[in-house]
Amino acid sequence: MVRDEADIVEASVRHMTRQGVTHLLVVDNGSTDGTLDRLRTLQQELPGLHVGEDREPAFFQSAKMTLLADILRSVGARWIVPFDADEFWFGEKGSLAEALSYSQYKVVQARIHNAFPMSAAQGLHIDSQPHPDVKAAFRPFLGAVVTMGNHDVLRPGNRGADLRLVHVPWRSQEQFQRKITQGLRALEEADTPNDLATHWRYLGRNSPEAMAEMWTHLVSGSGPEEMVWRPRGQLHQLGPRVPDTWLEVTRAMGIPEQGSPGSRGG
C-alpha cells in the first residue's frame, strides 16, 4: 500500500525483485505525485509486479493489509511480506527469498535500521541502533490479521527473527511535511482511536514553521522523543542508495563480519 512515494517506490520494488521475490502486489492509495504512473510503467517491465488502486483515503491500514494478505493466500503464496515503499528488506545471510525458503518458522521478524539524509554530507546515513519496533513476514494462514503499521501478524505458529530492514522514512523536507499532513488526515478520516498512531498526531499538529525546525534537527542527527522515526544511535554513511545485500549494510555500520577478528561469532 503506497501513497505519494514517487521518489522511492521504484527503488524499493526493484530491490524486492533483486531479493528474489517473484510476485509483488502494490496498491496505490490515491497518489497525486505520479506514483501510480511509475508503477504502471514498471509493471510493463516486471512480469511479477501486480498493481492495484485503493480510493479509500481513511487510515484502515490493518484491514486493508489483511485483505491483501488473504488475496495472496488464496492464490497460493508461500510467504507474505507486507512492505512499505520506504522499506528495503534483507535476509541476514543471503537474499530475502533465500532466508524465507530455508526458514522453519511461521512468522519471521525483521529488525529495523532507519536511514536518514544529513545536511553535512551527501547520501543516506544509517543508524547503527536498531529501532525498537519490528516488522514481520509470515506464512499464509486463513484468519491471519496484519496489525497496524505491519509491525506484527496475528496467527499461530513459531517465530524467528532472521530478517533485516533498512527504512528510509524521510527523504526531503517537502516529503517530510507532506507525509505528516497526509498521515494525520487519514487518521482523522478513519476516526482512529486517540491512543493509536500517537506520533502522527504529535507531528501533524505542529505548524509548518515547527515542522521546518524539526527537519533541521533531523538532518543534523537528532529529533524530539515524540518523533518515532528519528536518529537514536551513531549514524554511518551508507551511500547514495540502499545497498543490495545486508553484508554491505553491516560493513557501512562498521560491524565486523562473522568469524573475522573482532567479531563475536564462531
Residue spans for each PLM region:
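Catalytic-site signature of metal-activated, phosphate-bearing donor transferases
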Residues: 63-64, 91-266
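Short beta-strand-to-loop acidic/aromatic patch adjacent to the donor-nucleotide binding site
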Residues: 77-90
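Short alpha-helix within the catalytic core of nucleotide-sugar-dependent glycosyltransferases
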Residues: 10-14, 36-40, 90-102
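Active-site-proximal specificity loops/subdomain of glycosyltransferases
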Residues: 36-80
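Short acidic/polar active-site loop segments enriched in Thr and Asp
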Residues: 22, 78, 106
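Short beta-strand/loop segment that forms part of the nucleotide-sugar
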Residues: 22-30, 52-54
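Short, acidic, metal-binding catalytic loop of nucleotide-sugar glycosyltransferases
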Residues: 14-23
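Active-site beta-to-alpha loop of glycosyltransferases that engages the nucleotide-sugar donor
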Residues: 1-14, 30
